[in-house]
Amino acid sequence: MKIKIIKYDGTEMFYDALSFEFRTNQISNWIKIKFNNDETIVIDNVCVIKTID
């Protein structure tokens, strides 16, 4: 699945991900993205997440 992420500062990022998990707390919103090669990254200060067909 393709994911578009927009951070609060306006930065846009695109990823081709296997899956993702979104979490929020009092400090920040963050997304954990897992890729097909078992690599995982975490991005914080996420404002918008959009999946693209």
Give a label for each model feature.
Residues 25-40:
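Short, surface-exposed secondary-structure junctions/capping segments
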Residues 1-6, 31-33, 44, 49:
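Generic cytosolic/nucleocytoplasmic N-terminal low-complexity/intrinsically disordered segments
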Residues 18-21, 38-53:
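Structured surface patches comprising rigid loops and adjacent beta-strands/short helices at the edges
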Residues 1-29:
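N-terminal acidic leader/helix
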Residues 6-10, 34-37, 52-53:
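Short, flexible beta-strand-to-coil junctions
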